[in-house]
UniProtKB/Swiss-Prot annotation:
Gene from which this protein is expressed: dnaJ
Domain comment, as recorded: The J domain is necessary and sufficient to stimulate DnaK ATPase activity. Zinc center 1 plays an important role in the autonomous, DnaK-independent chaperone activity of DnaJ. Zinc center 2 is essential for interaction with DnaK and for DnaJ activity.
CXXCXGXG motif repeats: 147-154, 164-171, 186-193, 200-207
Superkingdom to which the source organism belongs: Bacteria
Repressor listed as a keyword: no
Function field: Participates actively in the response to hyperosmotic and heat shock by preventing the aggregation of stress-denatured proteins and by disaggregating proteins, also in an autonomous, DnaK-independent fashion. Unfolded proteins bind initially to DnaJ; upon interaction with the DnaJ-bound protein, DnaK hydrolyzes its bound ATP, resulting in the formation of a stable complex. GrpE releases ADP from DnaK; ATP binding to DnaK triggers the release of the substrate protein, thus completing the reaction cycle.
Protein name per the record: Chaperone protein DnaJ
Gene3D superfamilies: DnaJ domain, Heat shock protein DnaJ, cysteine-rich domain, Urease metallochaperone UreE, N-terminal domain
UniProt-listed PANTHER family: CHAPERONE PROTEIN DNAJ, DNAJ HOMOLOG 1, MITOCHONDRIAL-RELATED
Cofactor binding annotation: Binds 2 Zn(2+) ions per monomer.
GO biological process, one term: protein refolding
Domain J as annotated: residue spans: 5-70
Residues that, per the record, bind Zn(2+) 2: 164, 167, 186, 189
Any one GO molecular-function label of the UniProt entry: zinc ion binding
Amino acid sequence: MSNQDFYATLGVARAATDDEIKKAYRKLAMKYHPDRNPDNKEAEEKFKEVQKAYETLSDKEKRAMYDQYGHAAFEGGGQGGFGGFGGFGGAQGFDFGDIFSQMFGGGSGRAQPDYQGEDVQVGIEITLEEAAKGVKKRINIPTYEACDVCNGSGAKPGASPETCPTCKGSGTVHIQQAIFRMQQTCPTCRGAGKHIKEPCVKCRGVGRNKAVKTVEVNIPAGIDDGQRIRLSGEGGPGMHGAPAGDLYVTVRIRAHKIFQRDGLDLHCELPISFAMAALGGELEVPTLDGKVKLTVPKETQTGRRMRVKGKGVKSLRSSATGDLYCHIVVETPVNLTDRQKELLEEFERISTGLENQTPRKKSFLDKLRDLFD
């Protein structure tokens, strides 16, 4: 593993906040995760480097040591790492790199590693109708499941995990150096307190195997595009009996052919003939619940907005329901017949001098006269 600067490994500045470091780690860990890059040694090495960098920079004490001494703060073995503290390296086969981060930790609490299952994030696409009314969806997600051979224990059938002989089950070991009594995670069991002497052949002692799981997601009425649903305990299973992680489902709403959503309200264009626009009339308009009748007043102009109350989307958090807004578009007819042309020409002739019937046109002409007078 290279000794590249940990901040450079995560792509963050030295002054980066904890949240920035965590965000960068999650992005890179997802990118280089072995499950996403099978048989890719380069990605596997990158993943290890990212994990090592995050392990150091996410811990305040380790980060402080690294900022002061760099990689030398964590070099173990017989190389005399940590600059002038060469006498601390390699004693009794322990990695004293971790000890320095715990030198003044005190306490005798058990340093258990976090074996809880990973959180899993997936996306799902639904229709606007499903978002408005709510729907149940079944999705398949890649995950791990407890090994069916060892029942998740990690031990060979007939055997069982034994108390770690190094730490006697505490998960930590203590080292006495001069006046310092230092504590570190047990190098044998890695803090678990137990040691698997005969690992399961199928899972190789991990206690879980790759699988595909089907989960039913209850999507509530009123959900909006981009919102997430959390399913507790439906993420990756924990190791050696630890609790599972959570499943986060991000909902995406497919674009609708007619409606556009704005919060709880729906909007659509409603084309009408110029005859209906002038004379008024009644027509059917679509909603998410079927068709309803809408009365168009006479002398309706393009751009007029007509409301159909209660035909929007139900609120996710209250009993409120939005409205449907129909935006009128007066459509100019095309492909006219000779008879239609004659009637329109006749209409134009008999309309001459009746400027009050076209107030916008009259206003425009008046402005033109004022402009050039």
